[in-house]
Structure formats: structure tokens, C-alpha cells
Design a protein with these regions (language model features):
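Polybasic low-complexity intrinsically disordered regions
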Residues: 1-57, 61-65, 109-113
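Basic, amphipathic alpha-helical segments enriched in Lys/Arg and hydrophobic/aromatic residues
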Residues: 62, 71-125
Length: 125
């Protein structure tokens, strides 16, 4: 989960056999207590299920494709998470999946997120 500027708020790493919508439920429950200021989350159609909507008091707005869309089109809000993934993958350690455990993968994602924040702070200082 990231804010509209691409800063990481919450991370949840799980195995590849977990569907996005199923992984969203524990993520939203975790974020509810830690980030009570979040009122609305934007998501793609993979998260359009009643189970996700009922998991939290955070409003879920599904950003759908345009009706007349053909080919690739940048959608408002959907690209923010993908951009954050691209920034995180610039970290050499995250370029490939070297981690043996989910805990270590999560830790390195948080470390990469912290480095992004430090770079932003240094840029504005």
C-alpha cells in the first residue's frame, strides 16, 4: 500500500500462489490500525470483490479501463503503485528474488523504501 506520492505505507509479502484479492484482506486489516488517516484506496479490478470491500472501513474505489480503450493507456491512480515497484526494483538487492523467507523479503523491501525516503529528504535539504 502506497500513498498518492508513492511512499510506502504498508507492505505484505506472500507466496506466489496467493491471489491479489486474497492478499488484500490482511493488508487492509493491518493498515487500518497503523494508518487511521487513510479513508480511500484506489485499486484495479483484481480487488473488486465484496470480501475486500468488507475487510475494512477504508473505501475501495476500483479504477477500471475506459470503455473504448484499445491498447495501452495510462490510467489515473493505477500507475502509482507500479511506479513505486519500479523505484524499489532499482535497488540491486531486489532485482532478483534472492530471499529464502518471506520475513527477509519483507525486511529488504522496507529497507529499500527507507532508502527512497532518505533520498527524497536529501534532495529537498
Amino acid at each position: 500500500m502506497v500513498d498518492t506520492d508513492g511512499r510506502t505505507l504498508e507492505l505484505l509479502v506472500h507466496s506466489a500462489d496467493v491471489q491479489d484479492r486474497d492478499g488484500a484482506v490482511p493488508l487492509l486489516k493491518m493498515s487500518r490500525g497503523r494508518h487511521p488517516f487513510v479513508k480511500l484506496a484506489y485499486a484495479d479490478s483484481a480487488y473488486a470483490s465484496p470480501r475486500v470491500a468488507m475487510a475494512t472501513s477504508i473505501g475501495i474505489e476500483i479504477v477500471r479501463k475506459f470503455a473504448d480503450q484499445t491498447g495501452f493507456v495510462v490510467h489515473p491512480r493505477r500507475w502509482v503503485v507500479e511506479r513505486t515497484f519500479a523505484w524499489l526494483n532499482r535497488n540491486r538487492r531486489l532485482a532478483k528474488d534472492f530471499e529464502q523467507t518471506i520475513r527477509s523479503a519483507t525486511a529488504f523491501l522496507y529497507a529499500a523504501s527507507a532508502m527512497l525516503l532518505i533520498r527524497r529528504l536529501a534532495h529537498y535539504a
